[in-house]
From Swiss-Prot:
Main location: cytoplasm
Recorded GO MF terms: double-stranded RNA binding; metal ion binding; ribonuclease III activity; rRNA binding
Name of the gene this protein is made from: rnc
Intracellular or extracellular location(s): Cytoplasm
Family matches, as PROSITE patterns: DS_RBD, RNASE_3_1, RNASE_3_2
Active-site residues from the entry: 66, 133
One BP term from GO: mRNA processing
Protein name: Ribonuclease 3
UniProt EC number: 3.1.26.3
Purpose: Digests double-stranded RNA. Involved in the processing of primary rRNA transcript to yield the immediate precursors to the large and small rRNAs (23S and 16S). Processes some mRNAs, and tRNAs when they are encoded in the rRNA operon. Processes pre-crRNA and tracrRNA of type II CRISPR loci if present in the organism.
């Protein structure tokens, strides 16, 4: 019996050691607080209770990592493109931080081999990208901003993202938004708020996008097409970051469906 206990303890520490070195290889530096990375790799489908009985998973770290990653990318772009305007910087950042890109990078980093997740949801979309963001949040808490920036540059940007190529790619946010609304049976509308002239007497359009009559994003541009694109881009950002807003929009879908019945 005592031998069995020793074998169990030995297997536990062997697994911990293996996980530590796998983490070390991924990070490129030794982790200080190993437990924070374990939490970052713990999907809510495998939540664990802490000593206070509260469920622990990586959702809070994902929230933090998303903000830190966006801030780091903003700094990189601000320095790389000193003469470009806010619209260009925002558009370029959105291409870098989009979920499909983060999903692929997470797999390339090997996060799929370390994540603790229920087999039932492992293939759900964007789980790996979300976990990568939680991982970035863990690095920030463990090592601070500068080390996190170093990780993003050396382990994400340099090997996997060609910023100059991304800049040349055009993202049609209005088309993507329209497809998303069709898929989820959501009413998409664009309303002109006002037209005005700038200092050079050029006409500027201000347009808002509405999802099921909820204001989702406001855009400006020198044509209706440009301002609708900008409003669609702001709407995508809101869809991605504002869960309360999404619930309100989808509540409208359910209400409409029940009325139809």
């Amino acid at each position: 019996m005592f031998r069995n206990i020793l074998n169990t303890i030995g297997a536990f520490f062997s697994k911990k050691k293996e996980s530590y070195f796998a983490l070390y290889r991924m990070l490129g530096f030794p982790p200080k607080n190993f437990s924070i990375y374990e939490k970052a790799l713990l999907h809510k489908s495998s939540s664990k209770r802490d000593e206070n009985g509260c469920y622990q998973n990586n959702e809070r770290l994902e929230f933090l990592g998303d903000a830190i990653f966006n801030a780091i990318i903003a700094v990189i772009l601000y320095k790389k493109f000193p003469t470009n305007d806010e619209g260009f910087l925002t558009n370029t950042r959105s291409k870098i931080v989009k979920r499909d890109t983060l999903d692929k990078i997470a797999y390339q980093l090997g996060i799929n081999h370390l994540i603790m997740i229920s087999a039932k949801v492992k293939n759900h979309k964007h789980i790996m990208g979300n976990t990568l963001e939680a991982f970035i949040g863990a690095i920030y808490l463990d090592k601070g901003y500068l080390k996190t920036k170093e990780f993003v540059e050396k382990r994400i940007i340099n090997p996997y993202i060609d910023i100059d190529t991304l800049v040349r790619e055009e993202v049609n946010f209005k088309s993507k938004l329209f497809e998303w609304c069709q898929k989820h049976k959501i009413l998409l509308q664009f309303q002109t708020l006002e037209n005005f002239t700038d200092n050079n007497r050029n006409v500027v359009f201000q347009i808002q996008a509405l999802l099921n009559n909820h204001i989702a994003g406001i855009g400006i541009g020198y044509s209706k097409r440009e301002s609708q694109q900008h409003a669609s881009q702001m709407t995508w950002r809101k869809i991605r970051t504002d869960k309360i807003f999404l619930r309100e929009v989808f509540a409208g879908v359910k209400k409409t469906n029940s009325e139809d019945k």
